[in-house]
């Protein structure tokens, strides 16, 4: 695919394998570009872990594959999001159940997006690294707040990580 953003312009459903390939290709292309700051907030409730990201307008991003099913709460903004076979445009407030096993891509429009993933956390773990390893297939490039591309080298840097 010459244009990795074509994932958001598709007018028909594709196979899960094709969609996954498009998301991975987009991720690879995005890593060649300057990385935008995406603020990540962590909230712990009894038996629940909430991970909120605040995505600036006009951002294109990819997430990690999830190991478990989870709930999504799109608190505000509009985003085009890949599913296993197509792309949906969602506007907050909106909630949905998300299955395990998929890596998603998103394209934010003119307003910032506040997106919260809600996970079961039966042992009330508060160790972010442990939770990430439980919940995600962490890509070699890391997760949102650890990505930064500088002069062709990946550096690990923590951006705006806060705990509520």
Regions found by a protein language model. Name each.
Residues 1-52, 143-164:
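A short, N-terminal "cap"/entry segment at the start of jelly-roll beta-barrel domains
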Residues 48-66:
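Conserved short histidine dyad/triad with adjacent acidic residue
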Residues 62-63, 81-82, 98, 117:
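Short hydrophobic/aromatic-rich beta-strand segments that constitute the beta-sheet cores
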Residues 78, 103, 112-114:
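Structural motif
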Residues 52, 83-104:
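Short acidic-glycine-tyrosine-enriched beta hairpin
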Residues 109-164:
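Double-stranded beta-helix
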Residues 66-85:
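Glycine- and acidic-residue-biased ligand/ion/polar-headgroup-sensing regions
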Residues 69-70, 87-89, 121-124:
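Short, surface-exposed beta-strand-loop junctions and turns on beta-sheet-rich folds
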């Amino acid at each position: 695919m010459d244009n990795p953003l074509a994932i958001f312009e598709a007018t028909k459903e594709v196979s899960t394998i094709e969609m996954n390939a498009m998301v991975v290709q987009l991720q690879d292309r995005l890593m060649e570009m300057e990385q935008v700051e995406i603020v990540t907030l962590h909230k712990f409730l009894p038996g629940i872990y909430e991970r909120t990201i605040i995505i600036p307008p006009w951002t294109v991003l990819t997430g990690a594959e999830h190991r478990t099913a989870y709930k999504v709460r799109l608190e505000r903004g509009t985003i085009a999001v890949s599913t296993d076979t197509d792309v949906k445009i969602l506007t907050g407030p909106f909630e949905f159940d998300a299955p395990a096993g998929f890596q998603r891509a998103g394209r934010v429009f003119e307003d910032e997006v506040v997106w919260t993933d809600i996970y079961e956390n039966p042992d009330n773990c508060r160790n972010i690294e442990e939770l990430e390893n439980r919940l995600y297939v962490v890509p070699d490039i890391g997760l949102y707040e650890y990505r930064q591309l500088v002069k062709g080298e990946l550096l690990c840097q923590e951006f705006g990580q806060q705990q509520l």
